[in-house]
């Protein structure tokens, strides 16, 4: 550039000499009788020549910069082609870019970026601007993930910036960036879909009314190294409606559709499918509502052990572990019930716990080995009080989350018409034994603990082709028949009440119906959501019930309850008349989010390992691995 400056100085000197010569020639020609030229004309001519020389100098400087910087056309081609390349090559290119930045002493992962407001707040604050308005005296800083990138030239880039389930347009203009064209193009060529960026600029709306932020500073904060799936373009597709709890949804419209990929890579599922984030927000609201409901009724939230010496409180197969220091076998809890009732004995009259339970059983559309429940225990209450509380809690929750008592649910698949489920209280109530006899036209012996009753139920299952694998205990046979004849009728919320004692070892006997208990199960959409009863508080009867369960266990029913001596001892100190209640949080979340698979409402559901991992896990251990 110094050579160019010297040339400019020389040219200006020559121009001055030319001007002097021209002036002398004009004076000479005047003496010779030619027409005189004015001094003003000569000055104008001199200025024009100076402007031409200045323009030439600037053009030379631009040409010099163009040689030093990559050509805009080639960079645009790279930006356009990088998402067309092989995914592995794309990943390797991104790694090379980061390595190059680090080699130059740059930190591609800044420690901090100060955000002035969230994207939803930005939309709320500036959404009322008129089309074409810019507020250049206001400065805001936003951060989020780039979900869409497009450009109209090397000097103008557009981004969709997503955060907190909302998006705003970023309109990056080279003329407002404080960078020269080459630096601007390099920065925005390296910004990719999926990257997290910080933007500092002023708010405004485009002429078409798109709320945007116009950055003066654009900072790459974190980099997405993988090529993200993108939704196929469909010019005829309607803009999807915003999903709300209680309404149907369509996972087939998701960007990432494959269930295996979605459940194994939940982070990617949530990045690409906005609705998935809403599902988990709804689940959190359900838990929050339950907690608030019980807190308002003066319940105390407590925590009880998740590892126990005895797997009690429910009829289920436990997970077994080992405590090395104590050298003893422990069981992951299948229910917190027995501990919570001991707290009632201790004088805490209303307690509840929301937490994980673990059952080593099958995995299907409504069962996961690790699941979440809420259990509460209320002194001086019975199962009638709990039915009323259940109606108030669930109907109130549905109304708060959806705006009404009725929800839509794709019970028969997303390709079929949805059903309507009505949570308007009061809920339907049916007697288990009486309704079963009525629907299946049975006449079950009254003494359900007798051999006669067991044989009758075995014959009934055979007659209706209801499968009940061994051991064919009376409790298991009844459960299978109820699943065949009663549960399918329970679409709207329905209480199945007054279960037999042989099916309810922890429930109190019915005060007027021999052989039955004061218990209910709430079914919705043919699945159990709640289980509750008036608690058995007679320690002598409780020991006898545990003894009966032991007989079932000895006959092969490994889900039968074991005797918990500590619990029985606590009952001997006196348990007040108490009502106990349990709710399956996961299944309720499924209903209110139109989810047909329990994995949809669990961030990280239980999955079989991928085939290659499974093969490695099952391979014999070598001495080195041992």
Swiss-Prot record:
EC assignment: 6.1.1.6
Annotated positions binding ATP: 359-361, 367-368, 528-529, 584-587
Annotated coiled-coil segments of the chain: 37-69
Source species, domain of life: Eukaryota
Binding site for Ca(2+): 521, 528
Residue range(s) of DNA binding per entry: 141-217
Family annotation (Pfam families): tRNA-synt_2, tRNA_anti-codon
Comp. bias intervals (Polar residues): 1-11, 18-27
GO-annotated cellular components: cytosol; plasmodesma
Positions annotated to bind substrate: 313, 337, 375, 377, 531, 535
UniProt GO MF annotations: ATP binding; DNA binding; lysine-tRNA ligase activity; metal ion binding
Localization terms from the record: Cytoplasm, Cytosol
Protein's job: Catalyzes the specific attachment of an amino acid to its cognate tRNA in a 2 step reaction: the amino acid (AA) is first activated by ATP to form AA-AMP and then transferred to the acceptor end of the tRNA. Promotes aminoacylation of non-cognate tRNAs and translational recoding of lysine at nonsense codons.
Family membership noted in the UniProt record: Belongs to the class-II aminoacyl-tRNA synthetase family.
PANTHER family attached to this UniProt entry: LYSINE--TRNA LIGASE, LYSYL-TRNA SYNTHETASE
Protein name per Swiss-Prot or TrEMBL: Lysine--tRNA ligase, cytoplasmic
């Amino acid at each position: 550039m110094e050579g160019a400056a010297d040339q400019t100085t020389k040219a200006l000197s020559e121009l001055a000499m030319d001007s002097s010569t021209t002036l002398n020639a004009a004076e000479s020609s005047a003496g010779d009788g030619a027409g005189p030229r004015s001094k003003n004309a000569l000055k104008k001519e001199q200025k024009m020549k100076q402007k031409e020389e200045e323009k030439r100098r600037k053009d030379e400087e631009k040409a010099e910069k163009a040689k030093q910087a990559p050509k805009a056309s080639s960079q645009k081609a790279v930006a356009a082609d990088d998402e067309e390349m092989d995914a592995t090559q794309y990943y390797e290119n991104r790694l090379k870019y980061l390595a190059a930045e680090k080699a130059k002493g740059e930190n591609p992962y800044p420690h901090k970026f100060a955000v002035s407001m969230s994207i939803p707040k930005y939309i709320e604050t500036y959404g009322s601007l008129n089309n074409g308005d810019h507020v250049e005296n206001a400065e805001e800083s936003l951060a989020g993930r780039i979900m869409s990138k497009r450009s109209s030239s090397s000097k103008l880039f557009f981004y969709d910036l997503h955060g907190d389930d909302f998006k705003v347009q970023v309109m990056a203009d080279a003329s407002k960036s404080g960078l020269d064209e080459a630096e601007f193009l390099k920065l925005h060529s390296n910004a990719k879909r999926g990257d997290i960026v910080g933007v500092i600029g002023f708010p405004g709306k485009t002429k078409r009314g798109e709320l945007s932020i116009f950055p003066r500073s654009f900072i790459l904060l974190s980099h997405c190294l993988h090529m993200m799936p993108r939704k196929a373009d469909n010019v005829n597709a309607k803009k999807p409606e915003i999903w709300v709890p209680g309404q149907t949804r369509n996972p087939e419209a998701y960007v990432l559709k494959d269930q295996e990929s979605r459940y194994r890579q939940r982070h990617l599922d949530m990045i690409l499918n906005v609705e998935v984030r809403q599902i988990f927000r709804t689940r959190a609201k359900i838990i929050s509502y339950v907690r608030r409901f019980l807190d308002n009724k003066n319940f105390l939230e407590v925590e009880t052990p998740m590892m126990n010496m005895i797997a009690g409180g429910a009829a289920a197969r436990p997970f077994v572990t080992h405590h090395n220091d104590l050298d003893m076998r422990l069981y992951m809890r299948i229910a917190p019930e027995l501990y919570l009732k001991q707290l009632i004995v201790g004088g805490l009259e209303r307690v509840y716990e929301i937490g994980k339970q673990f059952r080593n059983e099958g995995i299907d559309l409504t069962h996961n080995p690790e699941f979440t429940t809420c259990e509460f225990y209320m002194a001086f209450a019975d199962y009638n009080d709990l039915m009323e509380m259940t109606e108030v809690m669930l109907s109130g929750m549905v109304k708060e989350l959806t705006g009404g008592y009725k929800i839509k649910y794709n019970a028969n698949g997303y390709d079929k018409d949805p059903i309507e489920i009505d949570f308007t209280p009061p809920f339907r109530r049916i007697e288990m034994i009486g309704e079963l006899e009525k629907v299946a036209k049975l006449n079950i012996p009254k003494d359900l603990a007798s051999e006669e009753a067991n044989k009758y139920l075995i014959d009934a299952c055979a007659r209706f082709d209801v499968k009940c694998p061994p051991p064919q205990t009376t409790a298991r046979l009844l459960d299978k028949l109820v699943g065949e004849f009663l549960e399918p009728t329970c679409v709207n919320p329905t209480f199945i009440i007054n279960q037999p004692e042989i099916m309810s070892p922890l429930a109190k006997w019915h005060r007027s119906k021999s052989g039955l208990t004061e218990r209910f199960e709430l079914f919705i959409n043919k699945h159990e959501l709640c289980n509750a009863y008036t608690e058995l508080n007679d320690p002598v009867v409780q020991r006898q019930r545990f003894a009966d369960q032991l007989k079932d266990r000895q006959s092969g029913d490994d889900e039968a309850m074991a005797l918990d001596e500590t619990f029985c001892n606590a009952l001997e100190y006196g348990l007040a008349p108490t009502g106990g209640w349990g709710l399956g949080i996961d299944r309720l979340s499924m209903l209110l989010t139109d989810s047909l698979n329990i994995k949809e409402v669990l961030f990280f559901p239980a999955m079989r390992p991928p085939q290659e991992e499974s093969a490695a896990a099952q391979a014999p251990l070598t001495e080195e691995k041992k």
